[in-house]
Structure formats: structure tokens, C-alpha cells
Amino acid sequence: MDNKIIIGVDHGNRFIKSSEGIYSSGYVESSTVPVITENLLYYNGKYYSIGGKRVKYHYDKTIDETFFILTLPALAMRLNKEGITSADVILGVGLPLSHFQLKQKFINYFKRENIHFTYNHKKYQVNITEVMCFPQAISGYMLYFEKYRELDYLNLLDFGQVTLDAVKIH
């Protein structure tokens, strides 16, 4: 594809967050067009009203299509901002350190070709050509690494809506 974009998506248990917006980590699935079509995703023959009540907590978010489906609106928002409807995507995602053994599984889950979907009445086509997976919260620490370099250890806390991840860095 001629268009290439890089986007980071935070797959929180309460909210999906990207540079283009934030929305609840939930949806209502339907086989027919719902009455309210705001934040409506059409993918693989089904309609998804994005937002509302969050989905149940998943330790492994790759067990079903839920978090892939919840990623598509973020991609659409970014493409829309760029004024394009198709692109090769480099997707950045994060995992808590306590879940980081799932890194390769997460990468394989998101890396897909020829993805067609409609979001808010606009058709999109993307190839997720590369997925980069990072440990959550570490990037914030790395911004100030020199400031804390002399410490023997540092407790790093990542507060989510329904989770708390704590890491001791030596």
C-alpha cells in the first residue's frame, strides 16, 4: 500500500486509548444494523456498537476477537485524521510486565493482512504489517532514567481501572 501509519493503542481493561481518542473497552454485537449508529463498527458480517459496558477482564486478551475488534475504531480514527481509508499499519501495543510472557502471542494476534471494516459509515482497509510490543509503564520511567540512575531500586506502579501492576526495578 502507498500509505503507512504508525499508531500506538493501549488496550486497557476499562478504556481503549490512542492518540486519536479514548473509548470504553466494550461493545454490543448485533447481526443487524442497530437503531443508534454512532460509533458503529461493521466487521466480518457483524455490527459492533463500540463503547458502553466494558468487557469482562481477560488475563490473556488474545483468547478471542474482542480486543482485535476494539482496536479497529482506533485505526479508523487515525486513518480518518490522515484523510485516507487504507494503509499499512505499524501497531504499537503494551503489556504489563506480569503478562509480558504473552508478548509473541500478542504480536501474532494483531499482525494481519487485508482487514476490511466500516466505522461510522466509512469503509477502511488495512494491513497490520508490524506489531511492536512494549512493557507498560516502563516508557514513563525511561524518560527520567538519568534522574533515578543512582537509586538502588525503584518501585514502579501502573494503576489501571481494575488492575494494579507493581514492578521493582534494580
Indicate where each model-derived feature is located:
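Nucleotide/phosphate-binding catalytic cleft detector across ATP-hydrolyzing
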Residues: 1-156
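Glycine-rich phosphate-binding loop of actin/hexokinase-like ATP-binding domains
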Residues: 152-170
